[in-house]
Amino acid sequence: MSQFVDRVVLHLKAGDGGNGCNSVRREKFMPLGGPDGGNGGHGGDIVLEVDPQVHTLLDFRFSPHVRAERGNNGAGDDRHGARGKDLTLHVPPGTVVIDEDGEVLADLVSPGQKVIVAQGGFGGLGNASLASKTRKAPGFALLGEPGEQKDVTLELKSMADVGLVGFPSAGKSSLISVLSAAKPKIADYPFTTLAPNLGVVSVDHDTFTIADVPGLIPGASEGRGLGLDFLRHIERTAVLAHVVDAAALESERNPLDDIRALEHELDSYQSELSADAGLGDLRERPRVIILNKMDVPDAEDMADLQEEELKKFGWPIFRISTVARTGLNELRFALMDIVREHRKKVENTPEPQQVIRPQSVGPKRKGRFADFEVHEDKQNPGAFIVTGQKIDRWILQTDFENDEAIGFLADRLAKAGVEEALWQAGAVDGSEVTIGGITFEWDPQTVAGVDQTPAYGRGKDRRLEQTDRVTAEQRKRASQARRGLIDEYDYGDGEVAHTERWQG
């Protein structure tokens, strides 16, 4: 029998984006071919997908470190890098994804349902993509963005219709073994069941699933016994069944006290839940009472004495014996009726319309109103920290060994309004400024509030502005001179050139 694992911690690392290429076209008869560096490919995502053939999280316990493929680098001749392959992890239905802060990222219940838990980094732009009318031959490219790295917790909550709860040795495992084909471990000592058991019960060409969780004892909410950890497997159930040992020999125990103690523990568990499982409060779930071991002497007498008090709960009461196999059919049909009623309610309840609005990566407004914040570093007076998703990405994608790339970054920050915001925050020339984890000594390019455009933008190739190549006009005059149509004279510096028509 495979080991049942219902909670694991995964260490995820999505693929890094590939670097852009810094290349110039070199081809015969193509002078000044221009930049032709391709873009890097995006890194691969890490995706969780529900697979109904998977029933446990066991595989992840031995392989908790997960890494997706990085994107390939760009190349010359405008060749873009390939995107890294997405890594898909198959999880069982009922898997809940929780981040490091305890927030639920996704609740995966439907077969084929997918969620991206770690996003790959964007590929860097090649110098061909960075070229513009004012930056015709960039001598740099952008680096790939690192992929998302995080730790997530996967919790499995069984998708059972009926949940069996009760004290240890109440006969829960025996009941699931006689109602279904499941073969759980059964022994005559407490806490025989250390992991949930699932079984499928057939009734009139219909089926429902039943879950047996480890036994509860008073004080379980405080950590006694196995605690309340396994109760997550009954959060999604349509009905809770109290399995009570009607033949308990302990003088301080009886069916009525057992049920009250169990309800107290369930109430404590529900109070600790941050959100329900979509079926409402666990305390309001339908319940039935199952008095087990009615084949034992004095069990009938004990049940008769407690029946009037048990009826005050207002729940159906069933007397069964898993050994003699009595009362099982009545119980089976009653549970099936409750499950069917629940399924009708779920089918008739329209699902809320979910409107997905993608989160914008860039600023809501362009220019100096980019989405970033500037605040003073409390640990270093006089220093400042700039935070913003897009600003941080610019830092990560800058090659700080390339002066032209650094200048391009400075231009972008100035156009985004970072310099003006730093002035307003009180920064002066030489102040330490931290952006994206990298600290600079601030050297402002422009005076605050003044729009200054440099004569030559960074990344602009001056060779394209100044050339010694002969112009078409000069070639025409030289041709006329060779044919004797005109006579050309060259004078020294400072004198005006003069052309006299040749008289022959």
Curated annotation (Swiss-Prot):
<dbReference type="InterPro" id="IPR031167">
    <property type="entry name" value="G_OBG"/>
</dbReference>
<dbReference type="GO" id="GO:0042254">
    <property type="term" value="P:ribosome biogenesis"/>
</dbReference>
<keyword id="KW-0378">Hydrolase</keyword>
<feature type="binding site">
    <location>
        <begin position="321"/>
        <end position="323"/>
    </location>
    <ligand>
        <name>GTP</name>
    </ligand>
</feature>
<feature type="binding site">
    <location>
        <begin position="292"/>
        <end position="295"/>
    </location>
    <ligand>
        <name>GTP</name>
    </ligand>
</feature>
<comment type="function">
    <text>An essential GTPase which binds GTP, GDP and possibly (p)ppGpp with moderate affinity, with high nucleotide exchange rates and a fairly low GTP hydrolysis rate. Plays a role in control of the cell cycle, stress response, ribosome biogenesis and in those bacteria that undergo differentiation, in morphogenesis control.</text>
</comment>
<dbReference type="InterPro" id="IPR045086">
    <property type="entry name" value="OBG_GTPase"/>
</dbReference>
<dbReference type="InterPro" id="IPR036726">
    <property type="entry name" value="GTP1_OBG_dom_sf"/>
</dbReference>
<feature type="compositionally biased region" description="Basic and acidic residues">
    <location>
        <begin position="458"/>
        <end position="476"/>
    </location>
</feature>
<dbReference type="Pfam" id="PF01926">
    <property type="entry name" value="MMR_HSR1"/>
</dbReference>
<keyword id="KW-0547">Nucleotide-binding</keyword>
<dbReference type="GO" id="GO:0003924">
    <property type="term" value="F:GTPase activity"/>
</dbReference>
<feature type="region of interest" description="Disordered">
    <location>
        <begin position="449"/>
        <end position="481"/>
    </location>
</feature>
<keyword id="KW-0342">GTP-binding</keyword>
<keyword id="KW-0963">Cytoplasm</keyword>
<dbReference type="Pfam" id="PF09269">
    <property type="entry name" value="DUF1967"/>
</dbReference>
<protein>
    <recommendedName>
        <fullName>GTPase Obg</fullName>
        <ecNumber>3.6.5.-</ecNumber>
    </recommendedName>
</protein>
<keyword id="KW-0479">Metal-binding</keyword>
<dbReference type="GO" id="GO:0005525">
    <property type="term" value="F:GTP binding"/>
</dbReference>
<comment type="similarity">
    <text>Belongs to the TRAFAC class OBG-HflX-like GTPase superfamily. OBG GTPase family.</text>
</comment>
<dbReference type="GO" id="GO:0005737">
    <property type="term" value="C:cytoplasm"/>
</dbReference>
<keyword id="KW-0460">Magnesium</keyword>
<dbReference type="InterPro" id="IPR027417">
    <property type="entry name" value="P-loop_NTPase"/>
</dbReference>
<feature type="binding site">
    <location>
        <begin position="212"/>
        <end position="215"/>
    </location>
    <ligand>
        <name>GTP</name>
    </ligand>
</feature>
<feature type="domain" description="OCT">
    <location>
        <begin position="364"/>
        <end position="444"/>
    </location>
</feature>
<comment type="subunit">
    <text>Monomer.</text>
</comment>
<dbReference type="InterPro" id="IPR014100">
    <property type="entry name" value="GTP-bd_Obg/CgtA"/>
</dbReference>
<dbReference type="GO" id="GO:0000287">
    <property type="term" value="F:magnesium ion binding"/>
</dbReference>
<feature type="binding site">
    <location>
        <begin position="191"/>
        <end position="195"/>
    </location>
    <ligand>
        <name>GTP</name>
    </ligand>
</feature>
<feature type="domain" description="OBG-type G">
    <location>
        <begin position="160"/>
        <end position="340"/>
    </location>
</feature>
<feature type="domain" description="Obg">
    <location>
        <begin position="2"/>
        <end position="159"/>
    </location>
</feature>
<dbReference type="InterPro" id="IPR006073">
    <property type="entry name" value="GTP-bd"/>
</dbReference>
<feature type="binding site">
    <location>
        <position position="193"/>
    </location>
    <ligand>
        <name>Mg(2+)</name>
    </ligand>
</feature>
<dbReference type="InterPro" id="IPR015349">
    <property type="entry name" value="OCT_dom"/>
</dbReference>
<dbReference type="Pfam" id="PF01018">
    <property type="entry name" value="GTP1_OBG"/>
</dbReference>
<feature type="binding site">
    <location>
        <begin position="166"/>
        <end position="173"/>
    </location>
    <ligand>
        <name>GTP</name>
    </ligand>
</feature>
<dbReference type="InterPro" id="IPR036346">
    <property type="entry name" value="GTP-bd_prot_GTP1/OBG_C_sf"/>
</dbReference>
<feature type="region of interest" description="Disordered">
    <location>
        <begin position="68"/>
        <end position="88"/>
    </location>
</feature>
<dbReference type="InterPro" id="IPR006074">
    <property type="entry name" value="GTP1-OBG_CS"/>
</dbReference>
<dbReference type="InterPro" id="IPR006169">
    <property type="entry name" value="GTP1_OBG_dom"/>
</dbReference>
<feature type="binding site">
    <location>
        <position position="173"/>
    </location>
    <ligand>
        <name>Mg(2+)</name>
    </ligand>
</feature>
